[in-house]
């Protein structure tokens, strides 16, 4: 991707400043300089241990706090606490915004706008971040908890093998939990009602997600389940 400044996006955002564009003239100059060093007996290794030692001046991953085993054994609730505002800011600040269409975005089955909503968290715009999450995901508050991020978006994070992947799932959970607690609800004011009616059998995540997509399209939806509560395996 090319930025408005005329440079390539990868060059601008490279955390180690290891990339630069070279033309034929520049490559020839490097070649001649190396030949002269070799002729003078001053040839040196291209290895840069100092570069690897200083790789990525980004804070290490912390993630969400985990409830102790002594407490977990007494219930079947969630074992990870949600991020607080300070933790969310810490994790969002770690994102290097490696590209407009970053690896995390491509590896997400829903192609969520991950770098964009992380930037909104960084700016404190939680409602806007929730709106963005909901544009591509029917259940972002659920996906933030149970989606296997370690082999999808977080598994593709640029920082994974260095300071640890950004905790994308925890940030998604933080966004939606916080927005819902603030009273936010998805905006359905622009939905145009249609005459079609659909019955969805099963009130698990798949059924609820299906009903959400249909409802956004204006279809009248009824969800049925044999259990008294929605959620299925959740």
Residue ranges and their predicted role:
Residues 1-197:
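Ferredoxin-type iron-sulfur electron-transfer modules and their immediate structural context
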Residues 11, 211, 231:
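Short glycine-/small-residue-rich flexible loop motifs, especially phosphate/cofactor-binding loops
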Residues 32-33, 212, 233-234:
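Short acidic, glycine/serine/threonine-rich loops at helix termini
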Residues 138, 204-205, 229:
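Residue-level detector of alpha-helix initiation sites
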Residues 152, 209, 232:
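Conserved SAM/SAH-binding loop-helix junction
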């Amino acid at each position: 991707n090319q930025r408005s400044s005329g440079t390539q996006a990868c060059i601008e955002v490279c955390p180690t400043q290891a990339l630069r564009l070279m033309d034929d003239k520049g490559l020839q100059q490097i070649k001649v300089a190396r030949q002269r060093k070799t002729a003078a007996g001053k040839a040196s290794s291209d290895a840069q241990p100092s570069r690897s030692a200083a790789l990525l001046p980004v804070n290490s991953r912390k993630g969400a706090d985990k409830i102790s085993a002594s407490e977990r054994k007494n219930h079947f609730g969630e074992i990870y606490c949600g991020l607080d505002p300070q933790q969310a800011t810490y994790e969002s600040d770690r994102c290097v915004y490696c590209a407009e269409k970053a690896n995390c975005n491509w590896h997400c089955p829903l192609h969520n706008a991950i770098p964009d909503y992380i930037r909104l968290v960084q700016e404190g715009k939680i409602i806007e971040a929730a709106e963005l999450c909901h544009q591509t995901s029917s259940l972002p508050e659920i996906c933030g908890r149970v989606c296997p991020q370690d082999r999808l978006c977080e598994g593709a994070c640029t920082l994974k093998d260095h300071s640890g992947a950004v905790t994308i799932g925890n940030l998604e959970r933080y966004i939606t939990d916080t927005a819902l607690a603030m009273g936010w609800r998805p905006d359905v004011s622009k939905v145009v009602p249609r005459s079609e009616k659909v019955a969805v059998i099963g009130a698990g995540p798949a059924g609820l997600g299906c009903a959400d997509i249909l409802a956004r399209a204006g279809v009248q939806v009824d969800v049925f389940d044999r259990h008294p509560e929605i959620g299925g395996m959740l």
